[in-house]
Amino acid sequence: MATINIGIPEADRIKIAESLKKLLADTYTLYLQTHNFHWNVTGPQFRDLHLMFEEQYNELALAVDDIAERIRSLDVFAPGTYKEFAKLSSVQEVDGIPTSKEMVDILTKGHETIVQSCRDVLKCSQPADDESTIALASDRMRVHEKTAWMLRAMNK
């Protein structure tokens, strides 16, 4: 196996990758939840929410790939099973089918949780001067902050 030399010490790479694994698990869990709500939303806002949830889960699917590939670029294996994601994720899963208003509130909390995960990634990557991970986490944080704001506005 080739030695990786990207200017980040191994201990830092592993620490950063561990924080990215949590971000990956949170993102995948929110992706699944958003897709579920897209399929099962009902009510007077059905069309708007159905389309908005579709936009969101498509964006999350791309993010999952970017995060996993960043983990791999640090020479660490990315988690890829529901069992691993369940252990790592802080995004709260729900039982049953919530109302459309509850769906919006649940997804808002999920996006806010991921903002916090992005901040944790930044705390690990900034001292190591890992600009690639910093950029990824900052970009993801911006998307999730904006999405949470838009979701909150739906239920006002």
UniProtKB/Swiss-Prot annotation:
Function: Plays a role in transport of intracellular iron from its storage (probably in bacterioferritin) to its subsequent use in cofactor synthesis.
PANTHER family xrefs: DNA PROTECTION DURING STARVATION PROTEIN, GENERAL STRESS PROTEIN 20U
Family: Belongs to the Dps family.
Top-level lineage group: Bacteria
A Pfam family that the UniProt record links to this protein: Ferritin
Keywords for the protein's UniProt record, in alphabetical order: Oxidoreductase
Protein known as: Protein MrgA
Knockout or disruption consequences: Very sensitive to H(2)O(2) but not methyl viologen in iron-replete conditions. In low iron conditions cells without mrgA survive 2.0 mM H(2)O(2) better. Cells grow at a much slower rate when transferred from 10 uM Fe medium to no iron medium. Cells have higher internal iron content than wild-type when grown in 10 uM Fe. Significant changes in transcript levels of 255 genes; about half are up and half are down-regulated. When combined with growth in iron-deficient medium 914 genes show differential expression.
Catalytic activity: 2 Fe(2+) + H2O2 + 2 H(+) = 2 Fe(3+) + 2 H2O
Enzyme class: oxidoreductase
GO terms for MF: ferric iron binding; oxidoreductase activity, acting on metal ions
E.C. no: 1.16.-.-
